[in-house]
């Protein structure tokens, strides 16, 4: 603790010393009573004395640097034991409160100064009393402690010397008199708990100017930076939105299509001639807008611009032929008209004469446009239908329609489609017909066609579609026995070459392409047919032994047969005979038909007693290959029936055999086949005659309605007809062909197909892919014929009503989409329906259901009465 001296230095802000009054001090501790109470320091109140309120205004607060240096010098002065006191005790008390809180001097409000004045008046009146003395002691002790702490604040006065100390002391005292007046009110503010608000107010006064000026300087710097050429504002100016002028230009372009207020005002400001002309042209607002876009002051130039755009709609009407142009027409007119009218106005702006005739032109054009539109809207119904018939419609997207501007495009496309269809039909006709009885491996080795891959029959199995096209190839044309090459006569050439020399066959195999593995074996078989009739060559007999035999399906149960059918991916039928036939057909399609046909032909010989009328029948019976080759050639030739049938007469199968055998034998004996073949030009026609006879024999398995009647009712006359045809056709060269021996056993097989299952299976084995289908098709066709052949009957009405009503037939019910009960329909077919068509077979309810579903007929089973209870 520093010792406090009793010396007093009186400092005041004014020369008046009478303002300071010292009351009598009580006896006591000199250290405590050395400082005065702030209430006794000022006799008059601040409100009463005007000088007290003015003192703070004369002396400004010292700067921050002076205040800081004064604080340091006071500490030095206290070390040198310099005695400095302040006569203004109010400042001491206020500074004491600041030191207690560790804060600096705070400003004092006027309310606090008034409280100080009241305390001074009370002290004057009650000075001699004892309780006041006790209060003074407390305040004295309080000021004594404050004096110790005020050494740091009073040290603001720097005293290096006596002369300098007095001058330096005056400045902080004058400045503190105003601050002390504010700080005396701080104690009152502490009582009211208003420290935060007063702190903010105090800081406004004593805060250095640098802190307050810095943000202002920063703002000035930012403004300067924006104004500088290298500032941030110049850099960001390049990123500013400068689209105001562009938007105005766009607005002008868009508003050229119609009048606006601004344009009307401009028209009012123009000459009287323009006003008169504008009254004449109210129907075209586009022209008015286009006239004003150029802003010509001349009266006639805008009218010229008005008259010319009326010529532009003509090409636009041509563009409206497509759907895209019609949809986009209202959106494209503004841009097209604005560009065209601006150029026209610029070109005609110099012309200032001929305003009236131009206005007349616009009138005429305005009159012509509705006349051009009237007939479109006033079409009569007949004319409208005619116009629709004449119009060519093409369905597609708008982009495709827009591209088809030329009128020849549709015609070209139609012609191209027709040409492509012709090419397709030609390509289908050129396909060879020899891949039907080939093995599975040979089919995979050949070139596949999309149509053949997708072709399936009614049972879900792949249909026998022609795969290889070897007709047009020069190497394979020698070997294919086909009906498509009528003009070249390749069939008899092939027979002659094969029968004459076997070496030519080997050469042909060497020359044949790799894509024809199917047709290499079949011509070899045909060559052996002719050679075996004349020569005996048992070279190809081991081939029959290498192939597996047909399994005996009749010895298996129904479950085994159904499982075998499912292995082929087919649905097993309910009938056992159909299961066996289907399995035989699938096995033949998988393993090939050559061996199977040979075995079936041998069985058919023993059962039906069919014989060959050849010179050596024993040899023919020993060798199965002649029959195999015959059936193979027949199967190849029959596929060309549909293309050449109307121009070809008919012959029997026996005459065909004799033709081929006798012709080949004669050629082989004479050893000159080529010149004789050249001399014989009608032989290809006879080969096609054979084709037709083979197909007629197959037609008996799939008969037409007239063929069924002829077979069951008028079969003997048909034989006579066939014999007559044969005699007419083979009258000159083949007199032996008049024997009608071959069709008779086949017709008998066709008649007894429903009665004898053994013969039916034999018949199906001869041509297995077609037999089962054709039996089913026969029944389906018989059902359709029976339904259509049912006569309309009249049913008697009830006795109450009068007259009769017609009972609808099954055909009428089907046409009216009435639900057909399968039980009733099958019973009618088995009792009456099939008898109308002379059909002896009966139909199961499952087959009738399949027939109805295939025809798209609404069918259902009859609901039993027992089911209604549940």
Curated annotation (Swiss-Prot):
Entry keyword Nucleotide-binding: no
Compositionally biased region (Basic residues): 309-319
Free-text description of this protein's post-translational modifications in UniProt: Phosphorylated in response to DNA damage.
Composition bias, Low complexity: 38-56, 734-758
One Pfam match: Slx4
Biased composition (Basic and acidic residues): 73-89, 137-149, 665-682
Protein origin, superkingdom: Eukaryota
InterPro entries linked: Slx4_ascomycetes, Structure-sp_endonuc_su_Slx4
Places the protein is found: Nucleus
Region Disordered, annotated ranges: 16-187, 280-321, 347-371, 535-554, 605-688, 714-770
Alphabetized GO MF terms: 5'-flap endonuclease activity
Complex formation: Forms a heterodimer with slx1.
Function: Regulatory subunit of the slx1-slx4 structure-specific endonuclease that resolves DNA secondary structures generated during DNA repair and recombination. Has endonuclease activity towards branched DNA substrates, introducing single-strand cuts in duplex DNA close to junctions with ss-DNA.
Name recorded for this polypeptide: Structure-specific endonuclease subunit slx4
Organism of this sequence: Emericella nidulans (strain FGSC A4 / ATCC 38163 / CBS 112.46 / NRRL 194 / M139) (Aspergillus nidulans)
